[in-house]
């Protein structure tokens, strides 16, 4: 399959009880004035461009190398002077390296900084979206790896984003050293 407008915004999360749950927002644009755009984050390497050094597991014998995750940091849907941005699961990763050994508070702050930069007006403009201000975040889903970190994670998110509705869940996240991952949605204007 060829992804002509980039990969989707996505989050891959573990579960505590097995099984699979899929939540999909799909858009079929028949209106030529609607644009679907990739939003990269210069603070983080695109997941689909990760080096072999950070990819987990063994290489499939049928492939020349390990395959990368196929998602964008965010996708924006833009029409004329407004739109939405879908923020993929974001963690305390700079470049392609995890922030290790700093605890839940610092990982949460770094994750929020990554998201704030991702949806900043300057970054949106750099991505081809003529937004006049930062995206207004309207919801978060917060994935916390360890129960003992849940309250601290809530406190940091609430202090940084006091009026933002958020759902918190206890579940595994993308790398063993990471303690939190956050996805969200924002309004663009």
Model-flagged regions — what are they?
Residues 1-189:
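N-terminal presequence-like segments and the immediate start of the first folded domain
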């Amino acid at each position: 399959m060829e992804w002509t407008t980039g990969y989707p915004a996505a989050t891959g999360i573990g579960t505590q009880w097995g099984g699979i749950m899929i939540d999909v927002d799909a858009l079929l644009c028949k209106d030529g004035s609607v644009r679907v755009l990739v939003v990269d984050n210069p603070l983080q390497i695109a997941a689909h461009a990760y080096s072999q050094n950070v990819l987990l597991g063994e290489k499939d014998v049928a492939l020349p190398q390990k395959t990368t995750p196929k998602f964008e940091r965010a996708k924006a849907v833009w029409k004329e002077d407004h739109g939405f941005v879908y923020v993929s699961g974001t963690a305390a990763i700079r470049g392609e390296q995890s922030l290790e050994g700093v605890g839940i508070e610092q990982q949460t702050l770094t994750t929020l900084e990554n998201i704030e930069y991702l949806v900043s007006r300057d970054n949106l403009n750099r991505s081809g979206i003529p937004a006049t201000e930062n995206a207004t975040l309207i919801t978060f889903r917060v994935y916390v790896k360890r129960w003992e970190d849940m309250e601290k994670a809530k406190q940091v998110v609430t202090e940084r984003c006091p009026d933002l509705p958020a759902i918190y869940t206890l579940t595994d996240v993308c790398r063993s050293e990471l303690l939190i991952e956050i996805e969200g949605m924002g309004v663009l204007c």
